[in-house]
């Protein structure tokens, strides 16, 4: 699994997090509250402007009530799909 020249991992991660949040039916504000993060930072992640740390991914997953491994697998699949 390698990123092609046109791929931006931040954008893929952001789309996956945004999709998971949408699937959970919660707002950025609610996710921020539950995950202990700022809503603006979640917005930056979802727009592909910031790359979350592993700690942040775990916090987001806790707030989304999904396993981090599920999110990472979805990211991996999206990278492969776009390669």
What spans do the regions from the language model cover?
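Recognition helix of helix-turn-helix/homeodomain-like DNA-binding domains
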Residues: 36-50
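A detector for short, charged/polar N-terminal pre-domain segments
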Residues: 1-12
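Short, charged recognition helix plus adjacent turn
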Residues: 2, 70-83
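Short basic helix-loop element that most often maps to the first helix and adjoining turn
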Residues: 15-34
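DNA major-groove recognition helix of helix-turn-helix/homeodomain DNA-binding modules
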Residues: 55-70
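Helix-turn-helix DNA-binding elements, focusing on the entry/boundary residues of the two helices
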Residues: 17, 28, 39, 54-57
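Conserved hydrophobic/aromatic packing and binding residues within compact polymer-binding modules
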Residues: 17, 31-32, 42-45, 71
């Amino acid at each position: 699994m390698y990123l092609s020249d046109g791929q931006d991992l931040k954008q893929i991660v952001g789309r996956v997090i945004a999709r998971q949040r949408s699937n959970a039916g919660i707002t950025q504000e609610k996710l921020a509250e539950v995950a202990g993060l700022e809503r603006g930072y979640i917005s930056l992640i979802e727009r592909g402007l910031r790359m979350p740390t592993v700690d942040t991914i775990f916090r987001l997953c806790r707030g989304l009530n999904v396993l981090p491994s599920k999110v990472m697998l979805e990211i991996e699949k999206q990278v492969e799909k776009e390669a």
